[in-house]
Amino acid sequence: MKKRFVLLSALFLSFKFIFSQSINPDNVKSISFQKQNENKFSNIFVGTINEKFSLSFDILSGLEHDLYYVIEHCDFNWEKSQLIKSEYIQGFDDVKIDNYSSSFNTYQIYTHYNISFPNSNTSFKKSGNYIIKIIDEYGDEIFRRKFILYENLVTVQTEIKRSREIEFINEKQVVNFEINPINIQLNNPSKTVKVKVFKNNELN
């Protein structure tokens, strides 16, 4: 009976330790993308396939967690595509984030994390929609963000006008655009070309 009590106590202590190390998503702040050599931060990233950029965030904790990133290639509707990992990534993902630092002499204690792409482990082979997931050492997802990589295969001319409907003239706009191929043949464009307009840099 005594041995059983000791075993149960050990299991309880182990569970308590794991629980205390978990990350509350509400404690993740300042999630933002940044293009290399730019001071501007954004909640989305849209760039060329070889463009350098980074994702950074803060965790309001004095602990330095072991965090990893996982990358998924998506279709137009942001569903996971049929491509296997090796078709869109050169190298591999599920890599530990090793660039982090703890705050010093601040009222709010936090740990700052930063991931740069491309890096020695991960670079991109395909353009398209992507989702990056940040997971902890137990495989639990902390948060995810969307980003877009493109290739200059066409030129797009756009024109933005006020809505023609009087009731919405100060609220809505009309977007006219023209797509001109450069290094690609657009066969059946009514089906192969898809267009989406983002409002206020929101991909959702």
Q: Where are these predicted regions, by residue range?
A:
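Low-complexity, Pro/Ser/Thr- and charge-rich linker/hinge segments at domain boundaries
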Residues: 23-26, 149-174
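Short acidic/polar inter-strand loop motif in beta-rich domains
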Residues: 76-78, 136-142, 202
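A short beta-turn/strand-edge loop motif at beta-sheet boundaries
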Residues: 61-65, 123-124, 184-190
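Ligand-binding face of N-terminal immunoglobulin V-set domains in extracellular IgSF glycoproteins
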Residues: 109-121, 127, 134
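Internal, hydrophobic beta-strand segments that form the core of beta-sheet-rich folds
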Residues: 126-138, 194-199
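Contiguous beta-strand segments within globular domains
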Residues: 31-73, 168-181
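Bacterial Sec-dependent N-terminal signal peptides
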Residues: 1-23
